[in-house]
């Protein structure tokens, strides 16, 4: 990770990341796709709204775990296995406690959450059932994501890919069982998701127990240590808050769509799933630059970290341009894969065509944010995302939802507009940092 061809390292390390994200997205889309084939619009809406809430919770957990990936990566890069073991142990202790508290709180608040989402009346009970079952599975979701963050921190991006592959296969099979054969609709989708996550965690624990490596964990590593947790949270909390804020903006946009009726509500839910596929490459590049740059920073190779940023930006922008062009020609049949309702497909296609360009702009600020994470400067990403959400994404979405009743196309423009603001801020910060290397390279 800290020697050899930088471009090859980026490609080899990012491919398992990309496949992992693809499988994780497929995992989430299976619920929506299978419910869409066997259930009605109300079931599809229940799963799309419920899965959006679960996605928000998951990305916040992943964001918090970014602190572990970065700190473990720095320790490994500096060849300090004792410090790496301490980071791993404290990560496990902290996240297991967080997951139990989160599960209890969310189970109590499930109905208020469904109400806040302005869920259409026909989909309320299905959404409640879906979320209740998924909330019970939060400890498994947390366990999978912290195990993955630990493996990636030590430079292993392949094992998490295998773990999610197991979960994905199990989820698809269980969805067909619970939804197709047993007719459980939204509740069946949630059961499949929760059980599949549990299976994945069991498999990952078996791998950990059989694995022998240079990092040895001791009981003392699991005891909370103030400085270790502080360093993890210093990076993780801003990322968690940033990702949470972004997801809240998506939820707000979903509420705007829900208020337009069942057709637009289902359309927006489906497009968000498609967008999650388009964002696989930008997301994998962000994670790649975070992990690789962290190890190189730990090894004192700052120029190599910067070169890594150059390559991930090149890959991401090229990909974004290609995808944006393709989507303009295939939007209707693409949305139609997830619904049998022609009106939903047409409505969603307009939203997707304008939204697609966000793949370019968001891709740029994703890569720069990942670079900032590696230096412990995650607060910068929180700031630029907050500004873009407050100044563009939410107000523009609201304006479009009120003044353009016949099409979702203008609503889709809000996301790339917000990302453009983030890009401007990120580039400005990067240029400033380049002129103050002596300060930020010693963080």
Question: What annotation goes with each model-predicted range?
Answer:
Residues 8-69, 73, 237-257:
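Signature of the first transmembrane helix
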Residues 19, 23, 27, 57, ...:
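Residue-level hotspots within pore-lining transmembrane alpha-helices
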Residues 26-45, 114-121, 177-184, 244-277, ...:
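Helix-terminus/linker motif at the lipid-water interface of multi-pass membrane proteins
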Residues 12-28, 133, 167, 196-200, ...:
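Transmembrane helical elements of multi-pass membrane transporters/channels
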Residues 65, 134-152, 160-168, 189-204, ...:
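Short runs within selected transmembrane alpha-helices of multi-pass transporters and secretion channels
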Residues 44-104, 141-160, 254, 268-331, ...:
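Small-residue-rich hydrophobic transmembrane alpha-helices
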Residues 29-33, 104, 112, 146-150, ...:
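Alpha-helical transmembrane segments of multipass membrane proteins
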Residues 1-14, 72-139, 181-237, 293-358, ...:
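Short alpha-helical transmembrane segments in multi-pass integral membrane proteins
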């Amino acid at each position: 990770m800290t020697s050899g061809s930088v471009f090859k390292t980026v490609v080899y390390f990012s491919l398992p990341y990309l496949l992992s994200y693809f499988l994780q997205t497929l995992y989430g889309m299976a619920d929506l796709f299978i419910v869409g084939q066997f259930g009605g619009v109300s079931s599809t809406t229940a799963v799309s709204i419920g899965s959006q809430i679960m996605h928000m919770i998951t990305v916040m957990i992943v964001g918090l775990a970014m602190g572990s990936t970065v700190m473990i990566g720095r320790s490994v890069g500096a060849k300090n296995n004792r410090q790496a073991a301490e980071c791993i142990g404290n990560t496990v202790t902290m996240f297991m406690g967080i997951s139990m508290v989160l599960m209890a709180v969310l189970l109590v608040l499930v109905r208020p959450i469904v109400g806040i989402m302005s869920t259409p009346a026909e989909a309320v009970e299905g959404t409640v059932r879906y979320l209740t079952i998924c909330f019970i599975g939060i400890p498994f979701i947390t366990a999978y994501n912290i195990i993955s963050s630990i493996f990636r921190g030590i430079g292993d991006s392949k094992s998490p890919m295998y773990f999610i592959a197991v979960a994905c296969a199990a989820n698809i099979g269980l969805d067909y069982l619970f939804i197709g054969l047993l007719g459980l609709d939204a509740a069946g989708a949630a059961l499949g998701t929760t059980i599949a996550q549990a299976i994945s965690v069991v498999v990952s624990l078996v791998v950990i127990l059989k694995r022998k490596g240079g990092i040895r964990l001791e009981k003392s590593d699991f005891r909370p240590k103030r400085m270790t947790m502080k360093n993890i949270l210093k990076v993780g909390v801003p990322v968690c808050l940033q990702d949470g804020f972004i997801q809240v903006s998506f939820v707000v946009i979903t509420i705007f769509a829900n208020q337009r009726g069942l057709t637009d509500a289902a359309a927006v839910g489906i497009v968000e799933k498609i967008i999650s596929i388009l964002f696989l490459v930008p997301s994998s590049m962000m994670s790649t630059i975070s992990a690789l740059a962290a190890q190189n920073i730990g090894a004192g190779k700052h120029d190599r970290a910067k070169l890594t940023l150059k390559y991930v930006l090149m890959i991401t922008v090229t990909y974004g341009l290609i995808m944006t062009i393709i989507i303009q020609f295939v939007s209707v049949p693409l949305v139609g894969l997830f619904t049998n309702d022609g009106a939903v497909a047409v409505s969603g296609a307009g939203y997707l065509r304008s939204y697609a360009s966000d793949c370019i702009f968001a891709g740029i600020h994703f890569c720069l944010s990942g670079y900032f994470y590696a230096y412990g400067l995650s607060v910068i990403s929180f700031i630029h995302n907050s500004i873009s959400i407050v100044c563009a994404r939410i107000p523009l979405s609201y304006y479009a939802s009120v003044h353009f009743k016949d099409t979702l196309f203008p609503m889709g423009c809000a996301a790339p507009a917000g990302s453009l603001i983030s890009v401007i801020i990120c580039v400005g910060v990067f240029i400033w940092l380049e002129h103050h290397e002596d300060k930020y390279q010693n963080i």
